[in-house]
Amino acid sequence: MAPVNNAHPSTQALHADDYLNLVTDVAPPIHLSTIFRYPNDPNQLVIPEDPIAEFDGKNYVYSREFAPNATRFEAVLSSLLKGHAVSYGSGLAALYAALTLLNPRRISVGDGYHGSHEVISVISRLSGLQKFDLDCPAEILGEGDVILLETPVNPLGTAFNIEEYAKKAHSRGAYLIVDSTFGPPGLQDPFLWGADIVFHSGSKYFGGHSDMLCGVLAVKREDWLKRLYEDRVALGSNIGNLEGWMGLRSLRTLEVRVQRASENCAKLISWLDAAMKTPDPVQGSEEFVVQAVLQKMYHASLQNEPWLAKQMPCGFGPVFSIILRDETFAKTLPSKLNFFQHATSLGGVESLIEWRALSDSKVDRKLLRVSIGLENWEDLKADLLQAFTSLTRES
């Protein structure tokens, strides 16, 4: 495993699971079975003392414990995330698992993804977990408590300083969970900046094709890994067999997908930002049309923060948000676009746009979240421009 662990991430994505291959197939086969035969030799029938600890990547028994597709998926993720990866049936199932593991009395969390707050509400109902703002005084937190930091944050796409929040948490004996969904491997390594647990909604960039649900936790501590496995067996929150295979297939192209989408996004942000900053644009020009429709734009690349280039040295993510001049513009723009699907979620190969209020009623009703895909960026630019122009003509 050492040569693979020392390899480039693109190589790891293709070979980190080679040692788990049980067949001669080059492409990993789809294992759908939920049960596996015991040995025929009675002498090999040994009652396990600890099925989790004794799993060797081959002695499968029941898929709620371990399954071939998910095990290979987790092997690649462990290499890419630089920690022990555990997969779940959804991102929120993964977050629930993290909070079950740590069992904090208090949690400090920002606005971010509304689903995370729903999980916190369930935990609070069961355990009395208290929720505080992300920037609450450090003195509120105690030993074993949690800061849940989403960066870049949903839906804006802006970033927070992971190291700053790690120091805050650790100064109080608390833990830092980083939701790095918007900053997949290749863009951001939260462990490098002090994260204790890294969390991803794998439905996004790990799946990458808008066709699977998945959640992932990565940890450094062996005792946490074992407890996560044990809890997953007890709660039955495993990723499905087919989803495990789909996730493995998709990880093979993770780096090239994320790079292309991030480059596309950077070019579009640069164009829109320049247009919005042009003084006294000529009526009818691109700059005039953009300014007539857009009021504000959010993306990590627009932040002038000295720490950000270190935290995200290879790009700032393919998701950004725009605030339009009025709510009617925001509701109408998606219907004017040809190459952007009006749908929720993000991280797929196709570009998406969402009037975000449909998913999260608490956000600004003039806000649209944009997830950039793998199309040619100039086609996306032309599509946005024609849609903006159409809105100005109808207003």
Feature locations, PLM:
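Short loop segments at secondary-structure junctions
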Residues: 35, 41, 219-224, 251, ...
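Conserved PLP-enzyme active-site core in the AAT-like
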Residues: 2-6, 10-19, 81-292, 298, ...
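PLP-dependent enzyme catalytic core of the Aspartate aminotransferase-like
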Residues: 83, 105-108, 114, 122, ...
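Hydrophobic side chains in well-ordered alpha-helices
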Residues: 73, 228, 329-333, 380-384
